[in-house]
Amino acid sequence: MQDKLNQIKELALVEIKKAKDSTTIDTIRVKYLGKKGELTTILRGMGSLSKEERPIVGKLANEVREVLEAELEAVTKAVKEAEKQEKLKNEVIDISMPGKKQTIGKKHPLEQTLDEMKKIFVSMGFAIEDGPEVEKDYYNFEALNIPKNHPARSEQDTFYINDNIVLRTQTSPVQARVMEKQQPPIKMISPGKVFRSDAVDATHSPIFYQMEGLVIDKDITFADLKGTLELFAKKMFGDKVKTKFRPHHFPFTEPSAEMDATCFVCNGKGCKVCKGEGWIEILGCGMVHPQVLRNCGIDPEVYSGFAFGFGVDRMVMLKYGIDDIRLLYESDMRFLNQF
């Protein structure tokens, strides 16, 4: 058996010295030192040896193992270094090559328009309020005078998380939350993302931006609403812009109206953007419904107020003559670099 061990040692050393890559070295290691390797097999057969032979063979076997492991380690180190140098040789970096130009970002047109609108309202004394996008059904509907089974709910295809939790369909819930925790006077705007289960096309998106406003105090009238929104329109679109109000219906305001402005592309003469009418619908508005005030803990006999709401995406599309809302969400730098 001692001769067999010496023979294994000599054969293994020859193979190790011939090894030129890591794969060959691993194969040799398994062949001689693995669980089913030749040296391991001999060690398992030591039980058949006499008591006198066992210590001699055991000592020799351990010596052979140590020699082979040391040689394998040395060759492995040399081979890995050679492989590293070969890899570096084949992956030479040409430092004279021009670098890749980094794309420089800029403010998205939606963000630009939001900032402009917020700046105008803040200059008029409005505070900016925020609220959850995942909202309770109560704040999104019932607090705003839209009870269950109200026909207005069918107009808003809603994403329901469960029976009582929705993705907000408007930023009006922020107003309800503010009225609950704060007594008048209240003067606020609530910009943010809203969600509706609309099929995506040129004018509809399941995610878009709104900005809604609310003013509550004693003796607030429709004249205050008109004055506020007309001033906003002049600051947003220029002093020459004209506005008009048309009667409308919203469940959370009474009376309700929609405000139109003279087309800022053709100055009211009629064009493709305004469909030849000279006017563009800008927003919905109205006096806060007394029931909404009651729902939020405010006495409608003492206080009154007005509310309004913009579709920010629509404002951007109208302002820049964009005819497809999908362009605002595709992150195409060829489009965004125009703003």
UniProtKB/Swiss-Prot annotation:
Subcellular location: Cytoplasm
Family matches, as Pfam families: Phe_tRNA-synt_N, tRNA-synt_2d
Record's catalysed reaction(s): tRNA(Phe) + L-phenylalanine + ATP = L-phenylalanyl-tRNA(Phe) + AMP + diphosphate + H(+)
Family: Belongs to the class-II aminoacyl-tRNA synthetase family. Phe-tRNA synthetase alpha subunit type 1 subfamily.
InterPro entries: aa-tRNA-synth_II (IPR006195), aa-tRNA-synth_II/BPL/LPL (IPR045864), Phe-tRNA-synth_IIc_asu (IPR004529), Phe-tRNA_ligase_II_N (IPR004188), Phe_tRNA_ligase_alpha1_bac (IPR022911), Phenylalanyl-tRNA_Synthase (IPR002319), tRNA-bd_arm (IPR010978)
Protein name per the record: Phenylalanine--tRNA ligase alpha subunit
Recorded name of the encoding gene: pheS
Cofactor: Mg(2+)
ATP-binding found in the keyword field: yes
Entry keyword annotation includes S-adenosyl-L-methionine: no
GO BP terms: phenylalanyl-tRNA aminoacylation
CDD domains in the cross-refs: PheRS_alpha_core
Cellular component GO terms, alphabetical: cytoplasm
Organism: Clostridium perfringens (strain SM101 / Type A)
Classification via PANTHER family: PHENYLALANINE--TRNA LIGASE, MITOCHONDRIAL (PTHR11538:SF41), PHENYLALANYL-TRNA SYNTHETASE (PTHR11538)
Binding site for Mg(2+): E254
A GO MF label: tRNA binding
Main location: cytoplasm
Alphabetically ordered keywords of this record: Aminoacyl-tRNA synthetase, ATP-binding, Cytoplasm, Ligase, Magnesium, Metal-binding, Nucleotide-binding, Protein biosynthesis
Subunit and interaction comment: Tetramer of two alpha and two beta subunits.
E.C. no: 6.1.1.20
Cofactor, how bound (note): Binds 2 magnesium ions per tetramer.
